Amino acid sequence: MADHDVAFWCLYFLCSAIRSNIGIAQTMNVSDRHDLMSVLHMTPKDTSTALALFYVSYVIFDLPSNLVMSRLNPRVWMARIVFATSLVGTCFAAVQSVWSLKLLRFLLGMVIAGMWPGMAYYLTLFYPPSRTGKRIGMYFTASQVSAAVVGLVSAGFQLMDSLGGLTGFRWMFLIYGLVGIVLSFALLWWLPDRPLAPGQVRHRSKWLSWLPHSPEALTGDDATVHYQDLRRVYHPRPWTIRDLVEVLLDWRLWPLTLMYFGVVGVGIGTQLYGSVIIAAIQPTASAITIDLIAIIIVTPLSDRFHRLRAFFFSAAACIQIAGLLVTTFAVNGWARYSGLLMVGFGLGPTVPICMAWTSETFQRRHGEVGVAAATALVSGLGNLGSITTTYALYAGWPEDAMKGPHRFRKSNLVMVGILGLSIASALVMAVLLRMFGNPPSTKLDNDVLNEPEDGAARREAHQPSSLTLRGIMTNLFNSLGHQQEDPSFAIVSSNRLSRAAAARRRRE
């Protein structure tokens, strides 16, 4: 799956760049009045509306897109998302008025909807959900890196200003869009199909016969071992509207949505507010670098101790709160920037942890439709936080956006309160899961609900309680000192060798 991981990273990197380059376009070639706002004669309110319209359509179409992906070939649907996103992104190069910009932003949110939750769903086809956190975190870094790269590359596009009669930002929209269109076709060869059970033959419908064949992610004994590991948690079966309604009525969905709402809103708010601090002091250390470091450190730990996800999420959110308070009340510019770095460090792992916890909870409880619907709803409804920060807070709150020592102070304090709601939701989720558990739906087949097959899974199943200090210390002690002594590891090694030997005998 390593080369396929690169494919997911690249597609998310490029689509994130297409989504966010409107922010760079507002500052390109300002001295010549060839920036986006000057060319289209936009007001700050027009900017806030255009940014918010993206999230409105994203919220509306996130769930339908992910449900379609669960019914169709996932690699084809993911390639469709990239193609449509790139096509709309290319159209930004021809924008001539404010209303057309707003329309394209709405269309962009509509066509890109389902990409982020779709990647989380795609991962559950190949990995147990309890081990997807670090992989989701790795893909999430693509968005962070693209934000930095778009800013750096924009210098080159500014030099192309007036070349061929196009402004620099139009060249930027055009080239990013065309590169994305090329990538969308390459994904048909690059991304893997759904994994098959050993011995199963892939049948293709007539209307998909023209598509290129993608190599299987795993073959031979590796595929057999992988299938035995995955079948304990992966529940593929046809779903109906009634199944979807059961997912929507599951109380576990709503604490996760509130968790996502707060951290995503803070992420967007940090981008808006952070630019004010960065412009004032011109630092050399990047908040994005701190963000990446946190993802690399925390998300693997949240997978290893997946029953402690509430702890990891809450700790990261507390760091964000501390950072917001520092950057709000500190007087010195560098002190305020250090607070911004704290927000970046806390923000990095929270979104991947939230998505991984959603996949883990709803895969076991509702199967494939649970993952598809829950990840889309958490991502979609959670992005209402983005609408809040772009339209109601920061630049969308004129009195709070006035220049002065207290600029954006009220918006920051509102975000502190929203983060408190996210932390409370995580703790409520952990407590209620402790009280009521997460039993599988009675509709899931019993033969896929067997005991864990491998040593890692056995260790996961016997993790101590996540809500006690003893549980935390025991988990850490086992990880540092006794991981190789786990007898279940020897059992699974023996079982895997036996299965591999049996497979060789059958071939002979």
Regions found by a protein language model. Name each.
Residues 20, 54-63, 113, 148, ...:
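Residue-level signature of mid-helix packing/kink "hotspots" within the transmembrane helices
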Residues 18, 41, 64, 72-73, ...:
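Helix-breaking motifs and short loop linkers at transmembrane-helix boundaries and internal kinks
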Residues 104-142:
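Cytoplasmic helix-loop-helix junction between adjacent transmembrane helices
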Residues 23, 242-302, 310, 351, ...:
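Extracytoplasmic gate region of multi-pass secondary transporters
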